[in-house]
Regions:
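Membrane-interface extramembranous regions
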Residues: 2-159
Length: 159
């Protein structure tokens, strides 16, 4: 189904569109990045380091964060907003970003969290979140991007 808001934007039964989903994910990443710099929302704020497992700051008291970790969230958010402009780029953001988060999940599983290899830093809660984000972003990109890719293929065949 095509909407008047964007000629190539398809909405699925749940009312989701590829563009809006990528934009929403980008906004969430921006919000998380900003919240990571707010004392109170981030506990042990004074113990935050630029990077590394020594950072004692915990977003919402659960997720270990550092300045670098917060900057990564902000950059992912900016990328999501910028890439949400076209269906192809929105799909790339969701699937590619999801793949990055799955790589981070695997990395977080195999490193010793008490060493310099844990430079972002990660804790167990971060690892679970990275798995969920990776699977969700790839799933949404594949599911919502399916119609956009079908339309592109059909349009090329008509030419």
């Amino acid at each position: 189904m095509t909407t008047a808001s964007h000629p190539t934007e398809h909405h699925h039964a749940m009312g989701l569109s590829l563009h809006n989903t990528a934009m929403g994910v980008g906004i969430v990443f921006l919000l998380v990045g900003v919240l990571g710099f707010i004392p109170g929302i981030t506990t042990n704020y004074g113990a935050m380091t630029f990077a590394g497992h020594e950072s004692g700051a915990m977003l919402l008291g659960v997720f270990q964060v550092s300045i670098l970790h917060n900057i990564v969230h902000l950059l992912f958010g900016v990328a999501g907003l910028a890439m949400a402009r076209t269906g192809r780029m929105a799909r790339l953001f969701l699937i590619g970003g999801g793949a990055v988060y799955l790589v981070l999940w695997i990395y977080g599983l195999i490193i010793n969290q008490e060493t310099g290899a844990n430079f972002v830093p990660f804790n167990t809660a971060d690892n679970w979140l990275h798995l969920i984000l990776g699977v969700a972003m790839i799933g949404l990109g594949a599911w919502l991007g399916r119609d956009a890719m079908d339309e592109t293929t059909t349009a090329r065949r008509r030419m």
